[in-house]
């Protein structure tokens, strides 16, 4: 049974009602959380994934065996998630990508949750990297060297998927999320 936060669902619905536009609602929520730190942001990201329809869990801080910030399950397989709050960095950098690789390696090595090498390792950040960022090249280099996919989702894209789930009143997930490599655009 998926846990969906009624308070966040109501916040999304109210934002849509107020603006009558998904884009304006996304902009308002993006701005609202622009200074959020990990204590607020990480849980919010997990709850957005739950609204979209995923079994997603926040890792317990300080647990060495749970390196990833959150774990999402698709078809019984674990997808590690590295989360970067806007308080940590406004635009995703190579640090988050390296941590996503580390999350995947540790998950594969320790077998804490069922997964496989072909499933992506995610990074969720406030803003996606610009097109000239080293992030894009690093994602390709990681795939070339290790055949590990790193997927990147920005806060605006995640909000768009969650708003769509709330407006349409159905859960459809994110198409091919488990195979995402590079930056997702809603």
Predicted feature locations:
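Catalytic core segments in nucleotide and nucleic-acid processing enzymes
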Residues: 22-186
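Charged, low-complexity intrinsically disordered tails and linkers
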Residues: 1-19
């Amino acid at each position: 049974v998926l846990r969906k936060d009624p308070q966040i669902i109501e916040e999304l619905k109210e934002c849509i009602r107020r603006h009558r536009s998904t884009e304006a609602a996304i902009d308002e929520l993006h701005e609202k959380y622009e200074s959020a730190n990990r204590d607020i942001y990480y849980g919010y990201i997990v709850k957005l994934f739950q609204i979209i329809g995923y079994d997603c869990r926040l890792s317990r801080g300080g647990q060495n065996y749970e390196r990833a910030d959150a774990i999402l399950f698709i078809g019984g397989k674990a997808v590690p998630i590295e989360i970067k709050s806007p308080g940590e960095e406004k635009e995703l950098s190579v640090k988050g990508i390296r941590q996503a690789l580390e999350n995947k390696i540790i998950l594969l090595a320790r077998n804490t949750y069922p997964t496989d090498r072909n499933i992506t390792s995610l990074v969720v950040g406030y803003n996606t990297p610009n097109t000239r960022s080293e992030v894009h090249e690093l994602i390709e280099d990681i795939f070339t060297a290790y055949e590990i996919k790193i997927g990147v989702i920005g806060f605006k894209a995640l909000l768009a998927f969650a708003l769509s789930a709330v407006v349409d009143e159905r859960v459809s997930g994110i198409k091919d999320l488990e195979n995402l490599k590079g930056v997702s655009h809603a």
